[in-house]
Curated annotation (Swiss-Prot):
GO terms for molecular function: ATP binding; proton-transporting ATP synthase activity, rotational mechanism. Produces ATP from ADP in the presence of a proton gradient across the membrane. It is a peripheral membrane protein. This is ATP synthase epsilon chain. HAMAP family: ATP_synth_epsil_bac. Coiled coil: none annotated. It comes from Bacillus pumilus (strain SAFR-032).
């Protein structure tokens, strides 16, 4: 099967680079499955897991929003933050989840949106880490 080169980059530098058979991302417009030869496009991403399929296995990378740029033989994901499943600090993600839930249980108008986003990021990281 043909492959597409994937690069996931954050402001801190590259997080993931490999040739894969398929990339799946959660764009603002919905789920996108990208194969080699895909039509060029750019789409904003939601907080979610990027699924990278190759050699019969699937790798997960947690991304906190950003953009995906698709070219026929290359996919570049520019994310505000990204972590591969083996790099997720599970204890830190659980603590962030707990703090966000506490803020949501005792809401202050200015904190609600921030707490919702923090909770989504923490749950995404835990999902990618398989916890």
């Amino acid at each position: 099967m043909k492959t597409v080169q994937v690069n996931i980059v954050t402001p801190d530098g590259p997080v993931y680079q490999a040739d894969v058979e398929m990339v799946s991302v959660r764009a603002e417009s919905g789920e996108l499955g990208i194969l080699a030869g895909h039509v060029p496009m750019v789409a904003p991403l939601k907080i979610g897991a990027v699924r990278l399929k190759h050699s019969g296995s699937t790798e997960l990378v947690a991304v906190s929003g950003g953009f995906v740029e698709v070219r026929p033989e290359q996919v570049t994901i520019l994310a505000q933050a990204a972590e591969t499943s083996d790099k997720v600090d599970v204890d830190r993600a659980k603590s962030a989840k707990q703090r966000a839930e506490e803020h949501l249980n005792h809401p202050n108008e200015s904190d609600v949106r921030r707490a919702e986003l923090a909770l989504k990021r923490a749950l995404n990281r835990l999902n990618v880490a398989g916890k």
